[in-house]
């Protein structure tokens, strides 16, 4: 590459300035003489530190070029394997693809939870701004706001029909909403602190809630009465989730444990203690995942002939763990997130696990091989929640950046 006379002159002056300002006096005077430079004060100012500046900007550009090259390669891969042009993927293997289809703004504070409606093409989001918002995920349209809570809404849950929505809040209440008329039909009081999690039981006639008051409570939908209290956690209970048939509930806590409870007797069936920090989130494995789990863990089907149940947990220790509840053992630990794990869920097809974290990413795990197969830089800030639609190819995420993003899967 040939430099023009002007460029050569600039380079020589920059080198001369570098030699002089770093104390290479002898080299400076020889170089100045050989390059026939007449340095004066005006020029000196202009070329002060120029060589270092050019040097660092070249390094910065190189780094940027490498980043862009790797993004380009990723995009090429997407194009050949994921697009409609390349090989057809089985829907069981569809995963979210960047960029997001929609980035929706409306909440005025961090988004705390995002969930899909079980029937209609809507999703619901909860936020620290004390509101619940309803959106159409296919068009990206905002539909309405449900107001009633007086403090941060922490969690939301539909019943299986999608006619009822439960919500819980730092205002210490749980509310039940008629999702057809969008009205609050019941408010439940009983917890003594922030209610951090809520879930409607599979049969639809009870609700479970978890609170910073260290308890889990079960409520009757019909009357709003508290019918059971589960005690055992030693700190704030972060999340509670019933299993598919509603005979068990799992909970996780600041006490670094995951507990599984028998609903009928309130007995704690398992206390799982391998995390080294607050356990933020849990999720039951769907039956579609059982064969992959057996392959991954080499666990033979038990004497009873039925594997599982299995549970996932995500923690501030940055790991995700998979547990076999029948034996109370950790089957695997997935390591890769660089910050607190805030959401974890099985892919409906059962082959993958999705997680989101305070490292601002969503990760897709091929857990059979215990590896992270894809990382999406999802938001500008911590990713607090994610949901994978059970039948449509969509994932939704919520973040402290106050946005909700809809991702298409293919």
Curated annotation (Swiss-Prot):
WD repeat intervals: 106-147, 148-187, 190-229, 232-271, 274-333, 336-377, 379-410
Q: Which CDD domains match?
A: WD40
Any one Gene Ontology cellular component term annotated for this protein: centrosome
UniProt-recorded Gene Ontology molecular function terms: dynein complex binding; protein heterodimerization activity
Choose any GO biological process term that the UniProt entry carries and state it.
establishment of mitotic spindle orientation
Cellular localization per UniProt: Cytoplasm, Cytoskeleton; Cytoplasm, Cytoskeleton, Microtubule organizing center, Centrosome
Q: LisH domain: which residues?
A: 7-39
Q: Where is the signal peptide?
A: none
Q: Note the coiled coil stretches, chain numbering.
A: 56-82
Q: Which InterPro entries match?
A: Coatomer_complex_subunit, Dynein_regulator_LIS1, G-protein_beta_WD-40_rep, LIS1_N, LisH, PAC1-like_LisH-like_dom, WD40/YVTN_repeat-like_dom_sf, WD40_repeat_CS
Q: By its UniProt entry, which SUPFAM superfamilies does this protein fall under?
A: Lissencephaly-1 protein (Lis-1, PAF-AH alpha) N-terminal domain, WD40 repeat-like
Task: Name one matching Pfam family.
Answer: WD40
**Superkingdom to which the source organism belongs:** Eukaryota
Q: What keywords are annotated for this sequence in UniProt?
A: Cell cycle, Cell division, Coiled coil, Cytoplasm, Cytoskeleton, Developmental protein, Differentiation, Microtubule, Mitosis, Neurogenesis, Repeat, Transport, WD repeat
Fetch the HAMAP family from UniProt.
lis1
Q: How does it assemble?
A: Can self-associate. Component of the cytosolic PAF-AH (I) heterotetrameric enzyme, which is composed of PAFAH1B1 (beta), PAFAH1B2 (alpha2) and PAFAH1B3 (alpha1) subunits. The catalytic activity of the enzyme resides in the alpha1 (PAFAH1B3) and alpha2 (PAFAH1B2) subunits, whereas the beta subunit (PAFAH1B1) has regulatory activity. Trimer formation is not essential for the catalytic activity. Interacts with dynein, dynactin, nde1 and ndel1.
Task: Tell me the function of this protein.
Answer: Regulatory subunit (beta subunit) of the cytosolic type I platelet-activating factor (PAF) acetylhydrolase (PAF-AH (I)), an enzyme that catalyzes the hydrolyze of the acetyl group at the sn-2 position of PAF and its analogs and participates in the PAF inactivation. Positively regulates the activity of the minus-end directed microtubule motor protein dynein. May enhance dynein-mediated microtubule sliding by targeting dynein to the microtubule plus end.
Q: To which protein family does this belong?
A: Belongs to the WD repeat LIS1/nudF family.
Q: What is this protein called?
A: Lissencephaly-1 homolog
Q: What is the lineage of its organism?
A: Eukaryota, Metazoa, Chordata, Craniata, Vertebrata
* Encoding gene (name): pafah1b1
